[in-house]
Amino acid sequence: MPQFGILCKTPPKVLVRQFVERFERPSGEKIALCAAELTYLCWMITHNGTAIKRATFMSYNTIISNSLSFDIVNKSLQFKYKTQKATILEASLKKLIPAWEFTIIPYYGQKHQSDITDIVSSLQLQFESSEEADKGNSHSKKMLKALLSEGESIWEITEKILNSFEYTSRFTKTKTLYQFLFLATFINCGRFSDIKNVDPKSFKLVQNKYLGVIIQCLVTETKTSVSRHIYFFSARGRIDPLVYLDEFLRNSEPVLKRVNRTGNSSSNKQEYQLLKDNLVRSYNKALKKNAPYSIFAIKNGPKSHIGRHLMTSFLSMKGLTELTNVVGNWSDKRASAVARTTYTHQITAIPDHYFALVSRYYAYDPISKEMIALKDETNPIEEWQHIEQLKGSAEGSIRYPAWNGIISQEVLDYLSSYINRRI
């Protein structure tokens, strides 16, 4: 088979002539060897002569080679190709070789293309039956169940995962980014993209009944195209989101917003985002490399989604599935495995007691369905009950110089004061 380098150096007219000559006196061997030429010609036709990269050529050539079939007697040839222009390709090849019939099957990276009626029927069945819905997510469910059956609490698992990043890199910044990302997805039951696309200029302080003051920010670019809020708040013990937010802001810089060329990008004037787009790849590798649990080493095991899986499980164990629905915006009818993998989000009022429960400054009484305060002097409500009490400090601009003028001064000052008191 002609190699990629030879094809690139072959003049187009010569390449076409060689291709046509194969069909003048066809044999099975000749036709079987035309996959590379087909790949190159099809790319030229569908991309108006644009050069093809080697990796792309190899990918497309594999698809054609594995699907190529022909009938010399009836002069017909069939193959799969990644395109939405199958009719154009067929017409172009027919023009080159009028005596032959070409059939091109659009390739979408799946075994077969389902009929739209089958797709709708399948989704309807999942909507009406939780058992059918569970089937699609059985692999992830089994792995998560294995993790939770280790006899450890959600918080012990969370702390072990946080600790595992200490051995990921010798660079403080890298470890800080991974720990911040994991904890942010955990406490917000969110996706990686939810945290990545947060608008730093949207940070603000909001009042909370149980914790006094918490930090709220906005993300408008989500996988479901529906905006949602992300929160950071004080928590008991080592798993304190504000401590990790402090470390993140001290060891990172604002990231210029990636230009989104689709959707409503023209109306989105966001200048910065919180994390780089490619962080998720190295984050997943870090989880796998220093995995505190064996399931992280599984190829398709939960990695960047582990935070939201853990929070969903925690709320479910507490018998608070209604909170899961609110935080993840899942409908009551589909609060099942499908809900846990759909994760649609919108700006929904999350009840104050969710933050109280996750902070661990409070315990939930399932009988009275009330939050019971645990005596702990580190609870910020013991000192700061209202936002007005925070005014007067100006330490944030010194502690977080990279974020001055981007994150609200009020938020930076509050976080700096909180850390000084906490330490």
UniProtKB/Swiss-Prot annotation:
Effect seen on changing residue 308 to G: Inactive and weakened DNA binding
Active site: 343 (o-(3'-phospho-dna)-tyrosine intermediate)
Domain Tyr recombinase Flp-type: start-end pairs: 136-422
UniProt keyword terms in alphabetical order: DNA integration, DNA recombination, DNA-binding, Plasmid
An annotated Gene Ontology molecular function: site-specific recombinase activity
GO biological process: plasmid recombination
Leader sequence residues: none
Expression triggers: Repressed by the negative regulatory complex REP1-REP2.
A Pfam short name: Flp_C
Cross-referenced InterPro entries: DNA_brk_join_enz, Integrase-like_cat_sf, Recombinase_Flp_C, Recombinase_Flp_N
Miscellaneous notes: The plasmid 2-micron circle is a extrachromosomal element that resides in the nucleus and propagates itself stably in host cell populations. It provides no obvious advantage to the host but imposes no significant disadvantage either at its steady-state copy number of 40-60 molecules/cell.
Functional description taken from the UniProt entry: Part of the plasmid amplification system, which corrects any decrease in copy number caused by a rare missegregation event. Catalyzes the recombination between the large inverted repetitions of the 2-micron plasmid during plasmid replication. This recombination event changes the direction of one of the two replication forks in the bidirectionally replicating molecule, effectively resulting in multiple rounds of replication from a single initiation event. Binds specifically to the FLP recognition target (FRT) site where it induces DNA to bend. Three types of bend exist.
Subunit structure, as described in the record: Homotetramer.
Family label: Belongs to the 'phage' integrase family.
Protein name according to UniProt: Site-specific recombinase Flp
Organism: Saccharomyces cerevisiae (strain ATCC 204508 / S288c)
Organism classification: Eukaryota, Fungi, Dikarya, Ascomycota, Saccharomycotina
